[in-house]
């Protein structure tokens, strides 16, 4: 065997026929770290690092998929990862992998430069974002998921106490199926505006006073929080379905309070 001979053809084992006749719903690569850029609500771009999962459907008669082509797709991709760009990336993956169905998921930290409510000092706050694109039966669906840290203050504690009320950091997680491109900041603002108070990376004493009093004047159970965010998502025509979660890391318990609302607007009577 002379590998240097230009007439030598290396065997392609993965392209051979598989006799077990068993299709694989999803096969591909996971946990690939690769840089990407996303577009902010102001139209600027933000560089970050994504953790990618890419897979396709494999027919029953095909022994293996083309694993290297998933990474090649990431190397060839460029430009901000908008919803439209994500759909185009999905189509390119299916073409490269010669597949009829597939899925791309990327998770990354996203930073927002926020201004403190009183002092005006600016600081970054990070959010966990996941974009998912899925093609099945000729239908392409795109999802945006964001985890938003906020503050919640207990209405019951406020009502029964002579002074003060227990409060804690909470997580609001919005996983929305998109009908149109929705900036990440839009989902973040919905969650923050419906919480007892939002968070900032840096606060001065006047800001801390504002945050404390703002939360005290706006108490919410985890049920209130998830319902108020859900109303906002229901009113947004760019969102066709969602899974919404709220979790309060209770400061007076060693457990969390949790609520979930799941809704598909297409199934309404």
From Swiss-Prot:
Keywords: Hydrolase. Belongs to the GTP cyclohydrolase IV family. Converts GTP to 7,8-dihydroneopterin triphosphate. The keyword Hydrolase applies. It holds the Pfam family GCHY-1. It is an enzyme of class 3 (hydrolase). The record marks 154 as: May be catalytically important. GO terms for biological process: tetrahydrofolate biosynthetic process. It catalyses: GTP + H2O = 7,8-dihydroneopterin 3'-triphosphate + formate + H(+). Its EC number is 3.5.4.16. This is GTP cyclohydrolase FolE2. Pathway: Cofactor biosynthesis; 7,8-dihydroneopterin triphosphate biosynthesis; 7,8-dihydroneopterin triphosphate from GTP: step 1/1. One of its GO terms (molecular function) is GTP cyclohydrolase I activity. It comes from the Bacteria. HAMAP family: GTP_cyclohydrol_B (MF_01527_B).
